[in-house]
């Protein structure tokens, strides 16, 4: 092939040392990966793609190799999402795994926010994702805390079913834990791109990784673990206009592939 594209450290090392043309996608770091990257970046046929700007910064590569480095965020699959959202006012949705690297994502703060009378009266919440036992725990949490609000915990759903939940909402939320450096600094959540392509407003916990996302100036941020900050952010979504399809047309998976091909040929 013209270029090998890999996310394997060992494939990168083997091909790089053989002077094969190889592009490595870097989504996070390990001690071994840092050693390998430092070694192979000296090879003329090695190029590296970083999932976000923070990953590039933490590589500590100098400007002498900048032509071999590319930042390419995730993108959305146009075949997955039905365009033309219903955009019902006041409907918040979270879609994704309820845990991250076996750690709590902080989902319960969403439920806590509905203890606020204004939020309870004006908004509803749908949480789509698993595992099933975590979804069950959230249902128990609602009951044990006597949360009398329109909150729907639907559990894990097939990918083919998720688009209907996006179309029936107008606010999407990004949650994660700062206990994991990947979540805090290096992620480029696929769900974000699906949210904005579905023309949802976006709420996000205030992490550097989320600040690096395309159109992050349109995200309403809140402080991790702070219910009052989340409540304020939910209310502030009324001041935000969702992105339109023309705004995000360059953020598709197909456009990402084109960018990578251009990078390979540069």
Regions found by a protein language model. Give the residues of each.
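Conserved acidic donor-binding segment of nucleotide-sugar-dependent glycosyltransferases
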Residues: 216-227, 234-239
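Conserved donor-binding/catalytic core segment of Leloir-type glycosyltransferases
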Residues: 49, 76, 85-115, 125-126
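A short, active-site helix/loop in glycosyltransferases that binds the activated sugar's phosphate group
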Residues: 14, 31-34, 42-81, 212, ...
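A short alpha->beta transition loop at the rim of the catalytic pocket in nucleotide-sugar-dependent
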Residues: 170, 197-199
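C-terminal alpha-helical cap of glycosyltransferases
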Residues: 233-240, 250-266
């Amino acid at each position: 092939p013209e270029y090998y594209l890999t996310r394997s450290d060992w494939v990168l090392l083997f091909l790089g040392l053989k002077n094969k043309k190889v592009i490595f996608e870097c989504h996070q770091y390990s001690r071994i990966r840092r050693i390998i990257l430092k070694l192979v970046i000296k090879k003329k046929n090695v190029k590296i793609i970083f999932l976000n700007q923070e990953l590039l910064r933490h590589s500590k590569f100098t400007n002498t190799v900048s032509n071999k480095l590319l930042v390419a965020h995730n993108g959305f699959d146009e075949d997955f999402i039905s365009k033309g959202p219903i955009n019902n006012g006041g409907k918040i949705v979270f879609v994704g795994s309820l845990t991250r690297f076996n750690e709590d994502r902080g989902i319960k703060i969403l439920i806590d926010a509905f203890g606020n009378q204004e939020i309870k009266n004006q908004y509803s919440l749908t949480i789509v994702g698993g595992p099933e036992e975590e979804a069950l725990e959230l249902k128990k949490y609602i009951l044990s805390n006597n949360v009398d609000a329109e909150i729907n915990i639907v559990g894990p759903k097939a990918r083919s079913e998720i688009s209907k939940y996006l179309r029936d909402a107008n606010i999407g939320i990004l949650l994660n834990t700062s206990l994991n450096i990947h979540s805090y600094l290096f992620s480029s959540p696929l769900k974000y791109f699906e949210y904005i392509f579905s023309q949802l407003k976006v709420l996000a916990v205030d992490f550097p990784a989320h600040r690096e996302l395309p159109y992050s100036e349109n995200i309403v941020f809140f402080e991790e673990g702070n219910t009052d900050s989340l409540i304020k952010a939910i209310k502030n979504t009324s001041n935000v206009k969702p992105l339109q399809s023309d705004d995000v047309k360059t953020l598709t998976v197909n456009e990402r592939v084109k960018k990578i091909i251009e990078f390979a040929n540069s």
